[in-house]
Amino acid sequence: MKIAAIPRASADSPNMSEKDMALFRLTVEKLSEEGHCTVVIEDGDEIPAGCDAIFHMTRTAQMLDRIAAREKEGAAAINSAAATRNCSRSTFTEILTREGIEQPPYTLLDTSMSITPVLRFPGWLKKSDGWSSHPDDVQYIATKEALINAIGNLRTRGIAKAIYSEHIEGDIVKFYGIGRHDDRDKFFRLHYPTDGKFGYEKINGVPHKYPFDEEKLQTTAFKAAAAIGVEIFGGDCIISPDGEIYIIDINDCPSFSAYREEAAEEIVRLITSKK
């Protein structure tokens, strides 16, 4: 197979660029070892015509447009340009709501509003569009005054829309998947995080490891991924003290740092299944 491989721009990988690049390089290496013609394309460069597949971690609009154009010519993109765009916070939140997938209660906010709506505290204020690339894109909010200040900061940064999600007490669990929901050999892993790219996990504290249905989480995660369209994905959920599962994040092609070796092998399997 002729495969174009595109890494993630460092600007889209805050505090995670080394881990993202490690997965990218390992996957490219394994593709080459299997005899596939793998061409690395820097973010911003043209994608050559005639590719059978495109493995990418990009999130830049220009490259997603170029990937979409090659998809129309017959290239299989993993993840597709459309699916990657669906991982924008506002979009995946809407998709999960439509699919009936449990999330913390949330409210859509306009940062230009002069009257703050009545909300329950504490909660999380999140930039609505795109992915988190700045520490203030997701903020823990304990009071109305903190909310007003945080909304003002987003407005100053030129961010027009935000999402306010109620805080759910419980354990944060990270999950990772590769494959389709109907794939018998799909890859799924989960673990309790110790530290994320911005340290948000510290708010929930040391995991209590509340019991929950792991099979239900896997089913829910792949249902969400299928609705969004991603075949390589990661995410975060809250496990409440009574074992309820609340999805709080879904993202395209995470670094899989805890499972890099086996994840790279699974990604290669997925890519080569497209021929």
Question: Where are these predicted regions, by residue range?
Answer:
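Protein kinase-like catalytic core scaffold
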Residues: G123, I163, K186, F233, ...
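Conserved N-proximal alpha/beta basic substrate-recognition cap immediately N-terminal to
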Residues: P7-D110
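A long amphipathic alpha-helix within ATP-dependent nucleotide-binding catalytic cores
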Residues: F198-I247, Y259, E266-K275
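Phosphate-binding site of ATP-dependent enzymes
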Residues: Q139-I228
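Active-site nucleotide/adenylate-binding loops and adjacent lid/helix of ATP-dependent enzymes
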Residues: A4-P7, G74, A82-G170, E215, ...
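A short beta-strand motif that forms the metal-chelation/ATP-contact edge
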Residues: C51-H56, G123-K126, F175-G177, G243-A258
